[in-house]
């Protein structure tokens, strides 16, 4: 995995600074990405496995090679990682395991990627040592095959409940699957993400559009009505008495862009 540096705008612009901030910590089979945690953040990421590693890398250059890439990483060609500790540059998480299997034998390794937030007063377990209690609890929840299988079943049950409110039986299997599964799934993704991560919006610029968000509700409202209601109230809060509205707003802060729209389809 390759870790972001927590600031999408800065990640894509201030390269000289970004190459100086990356910070990681390795504890057994867990790689903690803690860039700027000491200075200003209350969150970190962790990439872990439930088995002892043979070697690891946390530097992208060390894993891929200075002129290499993910298609043919230097560590894969060499047959081992170099136990690199990233100080700046591009922090990553890579595990290497050496396994010997008898004929017909099976072994499993569980990998997890998690995000942890700590209250400001609980950031450190000792001076300069990040508080790993929540990360350790997360790893303990998914430490065995049985626990992971149970979590996957719970996830499947969650989606089954969401999708079961609208099902098509047409006699055409592919049409049924498109309408009953993928159309609903895409409607939920669109509701959550709006136009982010597209050619139109990278995720940090325009926010959520007034008109688009109203339209997105139509395909989602039957799935989680309470969230649809919350979105309607958020959208309504950007509208004025004369019927005009802020053209877009940011979903995390609920703040609006600094201009109103005169577009007819925003009224």
Language-model-detected regions and their locations in the chain:
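Low-complexity, Ser/Thr/Pro/Gly-enriched N-terminal "stalk/linker" regions
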Residues: 147-204, 230, 234
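Beta-strand-rich interaction surfaces with strong enrichment in secreted/lumenal proteins
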Residues: 84, 96-100
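Polysaccharide-binding surfaces and accessory modules of carbohydrate-active proteins
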Residues: 1-78, 95, 120-160, 164-165
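Short Pro-Gly-centered flexible turn/kink motifs
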Residues: 99-117
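Aromatic-lined, polymer-binding surfaces characteristic
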Residues: 168, 175, 187-193, 206-210, ...
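Short beta-strand and strand-turn-strand segments in soluble, beta-rich domains
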Residues: 86-94
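Single conserved hydrophobic/aromatic residue that forms the stacking wall/gate
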Residues: 259-267
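Alpha-helical support elements that line or immediately flank enzyme active sites
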Residues: 210-235
């Amino acid at each position: 995995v390759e870790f972001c540096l927590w600031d999408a705008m800065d990640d894509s612009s201030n390269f000289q600074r970004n190459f100086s901030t990356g910070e990681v910590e390795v504890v057994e089979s867990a790689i903690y990405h803690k860039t700027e945690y000491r200075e200003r953040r209350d969150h970190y990421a962790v990439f872990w496995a439930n088995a002892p590693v043979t070697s690891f890398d946390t530097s992208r250059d060390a894993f891929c090679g200075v002129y290499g890439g993910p298609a043919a990483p230097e560590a894969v060609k060499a047959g081992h990682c170099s136990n690199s500790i990233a100080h700046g540059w591009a922090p990553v998480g890579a595990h290497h395991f050496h396994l010997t299997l008898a004929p017909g034998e099976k072994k499993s390794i569980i990998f997890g990627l998690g995000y942890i937030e700590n209250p400001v007063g609980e950031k450190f377990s000792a001076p300069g040592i990040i508080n790993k209690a929540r990360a350790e609890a997360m790893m303990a929840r998914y430490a065995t095959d049985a626990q992971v299988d149970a979590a996957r079943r719970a996830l499947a049950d969650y989606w089954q409940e969401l999708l079961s409110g609208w099902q098509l039986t047409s006699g055409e299997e592919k049409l049924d699957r498109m309408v009953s599964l993928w159309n609903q799934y895409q409607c939920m993704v669109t509701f959550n993400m709006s136009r982010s991560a597209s050619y139109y919006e990278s995720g940090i610029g325009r926010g959520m559009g007034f008109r688009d968000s109203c339209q997105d509700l139509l395909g989602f409202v039957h799935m989680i009505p309470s969230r649809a209601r919350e979105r309607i109230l958020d959208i309504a809060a950007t509208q004025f008495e004369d019927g005009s509205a802020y053209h877009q707003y940011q979903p995390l802060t609920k703040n609006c862009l600094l201009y109103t729209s005169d577009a007819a389809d925003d009224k």
